[in-house]
Amino acid sequence: PLVIAFENNYYSSLAVSLVWAYLDFPNLSLNLEPFGVNSVTIDDIVIPTNESGQLLINYMGPPQTFPHYSIADILADRLPKDAFRNKIVLVGATAIGIYDLRVTPFSSTFPGVEIHANVIDNILHRNFLIHSSVTRFIDVCSIILFGLILGILIPRLRPITGMIAAFLMIAAFVVINFFVFFSFNTWLNLVYPLITMATIYLGITIYHYFKEEREKKKIRG
């Protein structure tokens, strides 16, 4: 979370505090709505959050996307003199044995300190992933719309044609989802609409199969 509530007070996270200090302590504000936190603002940077003050992290890549330096090299003065000039420096452990590793989309052993680095990078470059009440509304509409289309279309098609139509709809939805994500940094739910479409297709297919079997038995009888 970017903010933590404790005894009726709100406290900023490490990433927010570091960016605030790096930008020379500009205006820092918390934007609240009746349902909870809406966003955090640092100067003119508006950071979108969920109602709990959590940021959806836009990971820049796998571990060591950001430069790592060994403390031994620093103590031995083996680094360039300007290695840390005008940089935000995070000090933390990255060894597996210290258990400060987290599961992320890029790795199951992602150093916790580099997660903070990703958050800081997101804030400074305003490179946020969007998942708001609007996108949640779109998610619901997608479930209803694709469900209705399949529910109306599949019963009117032959089995092979229906299977092709269902596959094309699912493929189109996946392509649109990825396009929106990579083009607009907007996260639309992929799982629930796909489950809905698969369930409706399988349900209708199974229903028609047993219906045809009953009709065949009647004809034989």
Can you name each region flagged by the protein language model?
Residues N122-G221:
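Transmembrane alpha-helices and their extracellular/periplasmic helix-loop junctions
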Residues P1-L148, T186-L194:
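Flexible inter-domain connectors and hinge/loop segments
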